[in-house]
């Protein structure tokens, strides 16, 4: 009989982070297929088994060992007080590549200006424990109630204030709310069960996954440029290349020419390529980068 197959159980966030997470994994080289209404994506890696679950519950189930590894926010690790290994910071969110913020917000017309003004007030939020800790640190007594969603619509009739997550602030502004204070900045993290982390095979698999995911994040907004350059114009051409590092220079069969290769910010390409061409570069082409590993 053959030895049993090694398997790593992966928890993926269901909901607002799902699409951006699956896109990130695809760039890292892991391609999932999710059927309609299914919570069990298929993947092109027979050593992985994935389940979609709400990010709010992820840290709890990773701690229990239901998953070897999962993705969730720092906020939910703190909120659930989960004992997990924080393997890697993955700074991306549903709409951008930046952290989200949990903020104290009130109606624009509210007299509340600081956390001290919350004494005796009602606050609605999904992160009850984070909010209670924040109030305790500021010596404020207020009633904190769990919000099942649509938190922005609750003030002023159903709550005096809310603690809500925001990425751009647009939803708060649309509901005529203003931010009083920021409680917490949060980003997605790759987390692991402690027993799984102590298993050599699983740890290597998790570390490889973290490396590839980080590489995919670092490659966001970057492209590669290749070109041929006459040696007598090399210094002039190099002056126009705003690369992450010094370009790679390779000799060509014609000893009067060299090949250059460099990684640049994609937003600079529209101005850089014309400058390179005018400086004497030829055969310039741009290519997409999925991963950038330092």
Swiss-Prot record:
Source superkingdom: Bacteria
Give the UniProt subcellular location, in the record's own words.
Cytoplasm
Is-annotated flag, keyword Magnesium?
yes
User: What activity regulation does UniProt give?
Assistant: Feedback inhibited by histidine.
Pfam assignment, any one? HisG
What reaction does this enzyme carry out catalytically? 1-(5-phospho-beta-D-ribosyl)-ATP + diphosphate = 5-phospho-alpha-D-ribose 1-diphosphate + ATP
Please list the disulfide bridges. none
Q: What is its main location?
A: cytoplasm
| Keywords attached to this entry | Amino-acid biosynthesis, ATP-binding, Cytoplasm, Glycosyltransferase, Histidine biosynthesis, Magnesium, Metal-binding, Nucleotide-binding, Transferase
Q: Name one GO cellular component term.
A: cytoplasm
GO BP term, pick one:
L-histidine biosynthetic process
Q: Which cofactor does it need?
A: Mg(2+)
Give the signal peptide range.
Answer: none
* SUPFAM superfamilies tied to this protein: GlnB-like, Periplasmic binding protein-like II
Pathway field: Amino-acid biosynthesis; L-histidine biosynthesis; L-histidine from 5-phospho-alpha-D-ribose 1-diphosphate: step 1/9
State the coiled-coil residue ranges.
none
Instruction: List, in alphabetical order, the Gene Ontology terms for molecular function in this entry.
Output: ATP binding; ATP phosphoribosyltransferase activity; magnesium ion binding
Top enzyme class of this protein?
Answer: transferase
Q: Say which family it is in.
A: Belongs to the ATP phosphoribosyltransferase family. Long subfamily.
Xref: HAMAP family: HisG_Long
- NCBIfam families of this UniProt entry? hisG, HisG_C-term
According to its UniProt entry, what is the function of this protein?
Answer: Catalyzes the condensation of ATP and 5-phosphoribose 1-diphosphate to form N'-(5'-phosphoribosyl)-ATP (PR-ATP). Has a crucial role in the pathway because the rate of histidine biosynthesis seems to be controlled primarily by regulation of HisG enzymatic activity.
Q: What is this protein called?
A: ATP phosphoribosyltransferase
Annotated source species: Prosthecochloris aestuarii (strain DSM 271 / SK 413)
Q: Its gene?
A: hisG
């Amino acid at each position: 009989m053959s030895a049993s197959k090694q398997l790593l159980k992966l928890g993926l966030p269901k909901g607002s982070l799902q699409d951006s997470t699956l896109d990130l994994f695809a760039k890292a080289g892991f391609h999932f297929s999710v059927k309609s209404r299914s919570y069990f994506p298929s993947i092109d890696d027979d050593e992985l088994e994935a389940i979609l679950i709400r990010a709010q519950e992820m840290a709890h189930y990773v701690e229990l060992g239901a998953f070897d590894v999962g993705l969730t926010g720092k906020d939910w690790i703190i909120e659930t007080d989960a004992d997990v290994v924080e393997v890697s910071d993955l700074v991306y969110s549903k709409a951008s590549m930046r952290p989200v913020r949990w903020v104290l917000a009130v109606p624009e017309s509210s007299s509340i200006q600081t956390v001290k003004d919350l004494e005796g007030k009602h606050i609605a939020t999904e992160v009850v424990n984070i909010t209670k800790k924040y109030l305790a640190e500021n010596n404020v007594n207020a009633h904190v109630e769990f919000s099942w969603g649509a938190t922005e619509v609750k003030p002023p009739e159903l709550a005096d204030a809310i603690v809500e997550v925001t990425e751009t602030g647009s939803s708060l502004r649309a509901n005529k709310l203003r931010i009083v204070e920021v409680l917490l900045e949060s980003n997605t993290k790759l987390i692991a069960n402690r027993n799984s982390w102590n298993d050599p095979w699983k740890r290597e698999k998790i570390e490889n996954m973290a490396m590839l995911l980080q590489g995919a994040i670092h490659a966001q907004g970057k492209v590669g440029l290749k070109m041929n350059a006459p040696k007598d114009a090399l210094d002039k051409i190099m002056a126009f290349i705003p690369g992450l590092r010094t370009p790679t220079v390779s000799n060509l069969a014609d000893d009067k020419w060299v090949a250059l290769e460099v990684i640049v910010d994609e937003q600079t390409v529209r101005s850089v390529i014309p400058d390179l061409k005018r400086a004497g570069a030829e055969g310039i082409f741009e290519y997409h980068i999925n991963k950038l590993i330092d």
